[in-house]
Amino acid sequence: MNQQLKNLTLPIYMDYQSTTPIDPRVMEAMLPYFTTKFGNPHSRSHSFGWEAENAVENARSMVAKVIGADSKEIIFTSGATESNNLVIKGIAKFYGNKKKHIITLVSEHKCVLNACRHLEQEGIKITYLPIKSNGIIDLETLKNAITDQTLLVSVMAVNNEIGVIQPLKEIGKICRERNVFFHSDIAQGFGKIPINVNECNIDLASISGHKIYGPKGIGALYIRKKPRVRVTPLINGGGQERGMRSGTLPTPLIVGLGIASEIAYNEMEKDTQHVNYLFDRFLNNIHSKISEVYLNGDKDQRYKGNLNLSFAGVEGESIILAIKDLAVSSGSACTSASLEPSYVLRSIGISEELAHTSIRFGIGRFTTEQEIDYAVNLVCSKIDKLRRLSPLWEMMQEGVDLKKIRWTAH
């Protein structure tokens, strides 16, 4: 391992689901809009404004191209959390006097679940569908859940914790046949897997800049124009972004999102091959060195930049402390301050004990083969050490069912 350290910079970043480093090409494109090209894109009476507006519209076209949309269907927001809130609350407010039922999954991102809980207090009925043990939606369950009161189905493209890819085309087909709007939080899939809003019959889609090597604080929302989808805005003001999201647009951030989208679109195949190769290398080497390691979520129907692994017989928190040279997560960054086991892992039927042992490893554009090999060796040596110290691991090896043990207080 000492030999490996010579050309490595520690700690190694492996938390690509929580955020990504900004691509140098993105930063280079943004810089002029912080300095000389500082105009307000809404100022129509001089060249500074025209220049900024032109940059914003170019970025809008780049974002639209990635998902096969029209640029007029893209509005800029501060990120996917705002986009999700605008969809769920905005659509319920606009159509709520006609339909009062929304369907989502128990494994959605916290911002979707909490927006839905907010609506429940306002009289909207929410159905939280269970998922199968591989993390994928059961389409028959979805069909049976839709009623004549159903307004919206909200299902994310790629799960942020376990990386599974939901069958968007099939979901979209069901929604279109039943005359229900289909929203997808595509933040973890945008620019990483092919998503075409027309082929998938997606009516609304949430996008984040910092998940695709772009800047933080910028995102987008795709809103279908034909057939037209309406939302009531969350923010009132000057009526920017087709009246749906008022406020002066942050030109440098939008330029960054546009360039990041263009790079992701042009290099998707290359990035996918790179990530898939490193995923297989990491997983195969881990399995060859230590036992009782479980991949959470479907192995094939997933974005392979996400490796969520459970290591039986040890605590996730102790693993993170032991492998401090790796920047990893024990769950969604939005909830990792909590010592509760991941609600996503619990929703796929994983026991509380095993859920507590899970670590999410993220692989991305800038991850190297050398980093993967170092990570594998570090993880395996530390897991082996922690297991040798663990009485629980010893009991498991002796065939003791930990669930049946009755612990007594002293």
Swiss-Prot record:
Ligand binding ([2Fe-2S] cluster): C334
One of the record's GO cellular component terms: L-cysteine desulfurase complex
Keyword entries, A-Z: 2Fe-2S, Cytoplasm, Iron, Iron-sulfur, Metal-binding, Pyridoxal phosphate, Transferase
Sequence positions bearing N6-(pyridoxal phosphate)lysine: K211
Annotated residues for binding of pyridoxal 5'-phosphate: A80, T81, N160, Q188, S208, G209, H210, T248
Cofactor(s) needed: pyridoxal 5'-phosphate
Protein location: Cytoplasm
Tree of life domain: Bacteria
SUPFAM superfamilies attached to this UniProt entry: PLP-dependent transferases
Active site: C334
Family: Belongs to the class-V pyridoxal-phosphate-dependent aminotransferase family. NifS/IscS subfamily.
UniProt subunit comment: Homodimer. Forms a heterotetramer with IscU, interacts with other sulfur acceptors.
Role: Master enzyme that delivers sulfur to a number of partners involved in Fe-S cluster assembly, tRNA modification or cofactor biosynthesis. Catalyzes the removal of elemental sulfur atoms from cysteine to produce alanine. Functions as a sulfur delivery protein for Fe-S cluster synthesis onto IscU, an Fe-S scaffold assembly protein, as well as other S acceptor proteins.
Protein name: Cysteine desulfurase IscS
Taxonomic source organism: Rickettsia prowazekii (strain Madrid E)
